[in-house]
Amino acid sequence: MNASALFKKIRVKNVIGTLDIQVDDITTDSRTAKEGSLFVASKGYTVDSHKFCQNVVDQGCGIVVVNRELELKGNVTQVVVPDTLRVASLLAHELYEFPSHQLTTYGVTGTNGKTSIATMIHLIYRKLNKNSAYLGTNGFQVNETKTKGANTTPETVALTKKIKEAVDANAEAMTMEVSSHGLALGRLRGVEFDVAIFSNLTQDHLDFHGTMEAYGHAKSLLFSQLGEDLSKEKYVVLNNDDDFSDYLASVTPYEVFTYGITHEAQFMAKNIKESLQGVEFEFCTPFGSFPVKSPYVGRFNISNIMAAMIAVWSKGTNLNEIINAVTELEPVEGRLEVLDPSLPIDLIIDYAHTADGMNKLIDAVQPFVKQKLIFLVGMAGERDLTKTPEMGRVACRADYVIFTPDNPANDDPKMLTAELAKGATHNNYIEFDDRAEGIRHAIDIAEPGDTVVLASKGREPYQIMPGHVKVPHRDDLIGLKAAYQKFGGGPLED
């Protein structure tokens, strides 16, 4: 597309050079800029990418969007605008033909449950033999093809490109985890959502948002906007077991469907049966009750299942077909995942990294603990430490607790474990500044019949170390190797 057409609907402060330039690609990453690229510079929290503009010109880029005129050598056009990231969103949606308008788009937000709900929606579509895409913590997936991702919600240009990829793959639907960071930073500008889903709101990310009020406001942006096309039929799915749903219902102009277990809602789960093999419940709806069976473990996953089913149903899919699909779903990797049931211990990994998430995790596994519950939890570096002692307190619901760092980054691992230990309510705990050593210790002290839970990371494949270097790390592989060495069996046996 010619740059003059690309900027036709955008008011700019100044243009230095000509807009008669062919633009084939838009990027905010200077490393990927090349001939035919339009580079958008921005002043971030830690880096001002305006300083890379000369680099992109040297790489062949002929046009840059900046918030001030720069001294650049070479044949380059500068487009000066007040808010470069807002313009980046507008340009990306224009160049890539407004991809979110071309499929059914689901947005899932909440402190806990985003990955599970979003993955369930994606898998329901696949079980119904429909092309589908997923974007979130576990990366980007079109049908069964997966690629890794850096953030839950990518920056605006990368996000638009992913939606375009889904459209090009003939996806009928795309489900996105929508983070509070992504909403607050405007990464979702221009995305047209058809259904917005809320799981819950508990303390997290206050290192970024500052207050729970600001955190909640960021979440609410998804429900008050859902895009700019007010003529489309759109829906909001809210968890009535969380009080914040009342506020979200008040700020959205769209039809609301509520679900719940403990609080009255339009859709409810009753007569619940739980085991480490899954859940069964009666799904009570405004138009009848339906038995549901799923391999997902834990009462909190019943809430996630209901949210996913309602979201897909709201866009016209038959509920019986959805329920049949749910019965066949594979559990979400790293979310209350039981590793190798043939082991004489129950070895479980989970992503729970907040006090609320840990409480729900322990609630889910405790009824099935035969002997001791050994619980390992980590605290991330450079994060909100005010939540840390409460995490330590919740962890002490277990018989034996292991405190470790989780992505310590530039923080002292010993400081992180000490913060967790401040909340300890008994003395049956130990601190390790090396998470892998903590995992091996958990297996070493476990006896047949014990349950070992490795919390905080799920299947995250790295530890973020000093200098923000990512070092390969897998809780599941470390735990399984230690278990096979102790109890025998398994492909990881030495």
UniProtKB/Swiss-Prot annotation:
Pfam families xrefs: Mur_ligase, Mur_ligase_C, Mur_ligase_M
Molecular function, one GO term: UDP-N-acetylmuramoyl-L-alanyl-D-glutamate-L-lysine ligase activity
PTM characteristics: Carboxylation is probably crucial for Mg(2+) binding and, consequently, for the gamma-phosphate positioning of ATP.
Motif (L-lysine recognition motif): 406-409
EC number(s) stated in the UniProt entry for this protein: 6.3.2.7
Protein function: Catalyzes the addition of L-lysine to the nucleotide precursor UDP-N-acetylmuramoyl-L-alanyl-D-glutamate (UMAG) in the biosynthesis of bacterial cell-wall peptidoglycan.
Keyword Transmembrane: no
Family of the protein in this entry: Belongs to the MurCDEF family. MurE subfamily.
Organism, as annotated: Staphylococcus epidermidis (strain ATCC 35984 / DSM 28319 / BCRC 17069 / CCUG 31568 / BM 3577 / RP62A)
A GO cellular component entry from the record: cytoplasm
Residues annotated as signal peptide: none
Cell compartment(s), UniProt: Cytoplasm
One BP term from GO: peptidoglycan biosynthetic process
Sites where the protein binds ATP: 110-116
Binding site for UDP-N-acetyl-alpha-D-muramoyl-L-alanyl-D-glutamate: 30, 152-153, 179, 187
Keyword Magnesium: no
Enzyme class: ligase
Post-translational modification N6-carboxylysine, affected residues: 219
Reactions catalysed according to its record: UDP-N-acetyl-alpha-D-muramoyl-L-alanyl-D-glutamate + L-lysine + ATP = UDP-N-acetyl-alpha-D-muramoyl-L-alanyl-gamma-D-glutamyl-L-lysine + ADP + phosphate + H(+)
Disulfide bonds: none
Superkingdom of source: Bacteria
Pathway participation: Cell wall biogenesis; peptidoglycan biosynthesis
UniProt keyword annotations, A-Z: ATP-binding, Cell cycle, Cell division, Cell shape, Cell wall biogenesis/degradation, Cytoplasm, Ligase, Nucleotide-binding, Peptidoglycan synthesis
Annotated protein name in UniProt: UDP-N-acetylmuramoyl-L-alanyl-D-glutamate--L-lysine ligase
